């Protein structure tokens, strides 16, 4: 009887946030799109009546958070007349994750003169698509979509790095950063041996938006105020949790952590002081009590939940040695001390009331 409807069938961790917008249309924001994102869409988006996404927020640059990026094209609004995405999906991340995405998914950062995002297009063949290419130039592209350079060996573009810039030989496109968050650039190599060869492909139409780093300064997604929560994911790696919701109805999501950083500790201390309160707390729990260098376990997360005193807590990211029902029977004993904490299950729907309506979240464990 074991199968995807069984609570022990677990995909990569993520949550889908659904909330009412004043314009009357519901918004859908996904936190993390890991290796099993496509499965989650087929199973749980359909079950919860979700057809498209408005935005994606990424916690970090590991495979379990970003390797489903290619499948975002399947959850974008489609214009049958133009055969292109009708809208651009916003993607919020830190700079490191953005740089990793450029290397892992260079085709999701298309050059306007070469490819058009969100639909089929023709343009100059790219060096990465040409096994015989030995003469390449660089096309520099701003994240906002404006071209800053010209094609292969062109007058306005650097030829083989001669005019400087961030290059990496024949490898994947390098990433460079200017002084402004709005001026991240990607360097694309254009094919020099067949400049008129057509490119035809359909890729997701995405807008890349870095959020404030190592601080809890908020950013806004269609009226939903989101606070980044920097945490350690191992001794030397910073990942991000996220917090949102109004006073007394906070939601805190910490999917990959070993320790909280000072800025996060300070904000959560304010959110646990009356009249404020955490309504829902989602915490990492790789194992029951075994130590891990990069993840919290159940014992660590129970201790944090006791300190933050949420109305409800869910554990995610469990290894497959957990038996869902048996573990939750043990955890229910903590209700005697006023702590409601359980293992989450894939597709679980949690309703959280907010000042402006309701947020419904589907949790993948």
Regions found by a protein language model. Give the residues of each.
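Binuclear metal-dependent hydrolase catalytic cores
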Residues: 1-252, 258-263, 324-364
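Binuclear metal-ion centers of metallo-dependent hydrolases, dominated by the metallo-beta-lactamase
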Residues: 261-365
């Amino acid at each position: 009887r074991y199968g995807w409807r069984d609570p022990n069938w677990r995909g990569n961790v993520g949550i889908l946030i659904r909330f009412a917008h004043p314009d009357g249309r519901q918004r859908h924001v996904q936190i993390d799109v890991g290796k099993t994102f496509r499965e989650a869409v087929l199973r749980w988006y359909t079950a919860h009546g979700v057809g498209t996404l408005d935005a994606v927020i990424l916690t970090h640059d590991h495979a379990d958070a970003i390797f489903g990026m290619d499948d975002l094209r399947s959850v974008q609004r489609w214009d049958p007349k133009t055969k292109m995405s009708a809208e651009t999906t916003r993607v919020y991340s830190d700079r490191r994750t953005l740089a990793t995405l450029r290397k892992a998914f260079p085709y999701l950062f298309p050059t306007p003169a070469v490819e058009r995002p969100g639909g089929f297009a023709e343009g100059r063949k790219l060096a990465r698509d040409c096994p015989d290419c030995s003469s390449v130039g660089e096309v520099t592209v701003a994240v906002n979509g404006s071209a800053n350079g010209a094609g292969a060996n062109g007058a306005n573009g650097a030829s083989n790095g001669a005019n400087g810039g961030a290059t990496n030989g024949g490898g994947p496109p390098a990433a460079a950063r200017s002084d402004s968050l709005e001026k991240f650039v990607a360097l694309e190599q254009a094919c020099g041996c067949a400049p008129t060869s057509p490119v035809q492909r359909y890729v997701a139409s995405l807008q890349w938006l870095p959020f404030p780093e190592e601080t809890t300064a908020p950013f806004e997604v269609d009226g939903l105020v989101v606070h980044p929560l920097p945490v350690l994911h191992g001794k030397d790696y910073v990942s991000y949790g996220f917090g949102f919701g109004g006073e007394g109805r906070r939601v805190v999501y910490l999917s990959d952590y070993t320790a909280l950083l000072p800025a996060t500790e300070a904000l959560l201390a304010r959110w646990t002081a009356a009249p404020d309160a955490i309504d829902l707390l989602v915490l990492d729990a790789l194992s029951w009590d075994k130590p891990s260098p990069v993840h919290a376990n159940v014992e660590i997360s129970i201790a944090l939940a006791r300190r933050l005193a949420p109305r409800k807590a869910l554990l995610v990211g469990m290894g497959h040695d957990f038996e869902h029902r048996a573990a939750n029977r043990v955890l229910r004993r903590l209700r005697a001390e006023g702590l409601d904490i359980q293992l989450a299950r894939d597709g679980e729907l949690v309703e959280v009331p907010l000042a402006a309506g309701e947020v419904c979240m589907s949790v993948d464990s």
